[in-house]
């Protein structure tokens, strides 16, 4: 009994290892339900046997919630240090309510409340979360690298603390040429053009004396301008406000270049000696 109790306590924060340890304990308890000494305790424990293994806790939400109207709550949760996982589907717009601009909407993108294109850059939610130093953070795009997404999800789940995984999510409001059937290809293009970057920040690496930041995408190899012009949320601005469109698109491209350069610097920081 002491051995099984030790195994349960040792795996209480590991959902992968917790299940086998719990199954072994349950099997042992079931063998001893008629034992004169521990039978009653075994029966009581088995009543709540479904509660023994560590549960995988995930919060799901969109960018309107995470970046904007629910940011205060999200920030409170990750700042608490509690072992909770958060997955954000970043469509860069309020998708469920009709396509209104949010703080996740990038420069130059047309949306409700930003009919002339958004003039200020997108909020950097990942950077805010990384600033705590004890939050696991990942930015992903399944169409660009599904292995990286899987790795991020597994790492987030195994991390004993708050985790934030932000995934690029093409949306019908983007007006993708070719439609939503090519959403995965659009994600790949977004990363190749430097429009979206994928990376991971794992605080456990810092504890090991390693750089906690890992950049998982190469330098942009495709045209940023060609990418955004493949979506109505951007190319429509060239028809309604052509001069403003040029100014905002140039600004957006510069923001993207500076963002990648900054991420490269983070990734190149030396490990602690």
Residue ranges and their predicted role:
Residues 2-3:
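Short, small-residue-biased leader/transition segments that mark boundaries at the very start
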Residues 35-40, 45, 51-58, 68-84, ...:
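Glycine-rich ThDP/TPP pyrophosphate-binding loop and its adjacent helix/strand module
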Residues 6, 10, 17-50:
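Long amphipathic alpha-helical scaffold segments
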Residues 62-64:
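Active-site metal-binding loops of divalent metal-dependent hydrolases
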Residues 52, 224-263:
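Amphipathic alpha-helical packing elements
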Residues 15, 32, 240, 255, ...:
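Surface-exposed polar/charged interaction patches
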Residues 252, 272-273:
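Intrinsic disorder at enzyme termini
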């Amino acid at each position: 009994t002491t051995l099984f109790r030790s195994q349960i306590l040792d795996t209480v924060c590991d959902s992968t290892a917790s299940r086998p340890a719990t199954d072994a304990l349950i099997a042992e308890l079931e063998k001893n339900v008629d034992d004169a000494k521990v039978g009653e305790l075994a029966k009581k424990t088995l009543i709540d046997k479904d509660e023994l293994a560590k549960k995988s806790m995930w919060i799901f939400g969109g960018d309107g919630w995470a970046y904007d109207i629910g940011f205060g709550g999200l920030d409170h949760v990750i700042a608490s240090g509690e072992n909770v996982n958060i997955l954000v589907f970043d469509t860069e717009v309020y998708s469920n309510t009709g396509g209104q601009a949010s703080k996740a909407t990038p420069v130059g993108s047309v949306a409700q409340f930003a009919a002339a294109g958004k003039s200020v850059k997108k909020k950097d939610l990942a950077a805010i979360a990384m600033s705590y130093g004890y939050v696991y953070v990942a930015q992903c795009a399944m169409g660009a690298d599904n292995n990286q997404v899987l790795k991020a999800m597994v790492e987030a789940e195994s991390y004993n603390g708050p985790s934030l995984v932000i995934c690029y999510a093409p949306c019908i409001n983007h007006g993708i040429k070719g439609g939503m059937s090519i959403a995965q290809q659009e994600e790949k293009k977004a990363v190749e053009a430097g429009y979206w970057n994928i990376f991971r920040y794992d605080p456990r690496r810092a504890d090991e004396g390693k750089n906690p930041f890992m950049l998982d995408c190469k330098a942009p190899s495709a045209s940023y301008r060609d990418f955004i012009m493949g979506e109505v949320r951007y190319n429509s601005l060239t028809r309604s406000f052509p001069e403003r469109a040029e100014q905002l698109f140039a600004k957006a491209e510069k923001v993207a270049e500076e963002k990648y350069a900054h991420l490269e610097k983070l990734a190149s920081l030396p490990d602690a000696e």
